[in-house]
């Protein structure tokens, strides 16, 4: 799926640059370098991989691929232990603590994240070089993570968003799009929160007139909600996303 989207977006960029000019088309990417999937990988490495093995892996050429294996192993381990109430709660607390460290940018898991994140970046660059694909701007999920929550709070204070059962978002039931949840009742954000902030940055940083998202069809409802929210917040460009 990732390779299909990569080929599709690169083809679109090349075609549009031939039609409209190199300088009028801006290519961007949005790698997910934080989130539960990252926390699971870090959790498994810290709890189930020896320092010796980690050091050996850190010097190996396939260390990027190894991280993918660690995520899969961590996911399976957590699923196996989910049936044990005490262990489930303990693991849940540890994952929450990991995500908190990444958000605060401090702690042993943040240090581990910085090192292993670079492995992933190196692998991505290697793949992109092989595929002859490049981007004008890399937006990182970690770059918009905390800022996205503050942006939603700001719009809520301005009266542009609404609260429902402690959560913040917008109700688009009349458009058959349901409720676009932007902040959960515990104050944490979601993918829509980050996509809202990402779009805001692209609109304001590049003053773009049209934004094309190359994503899976299964994300159609999600992005319809995000674009509708952006329109509501005054971003007219969202009508042409």
Give the ranges of each region predicted by the language model.
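NTP-dependent nucleotidyl-transfer catalytic core
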Residues: 1-241
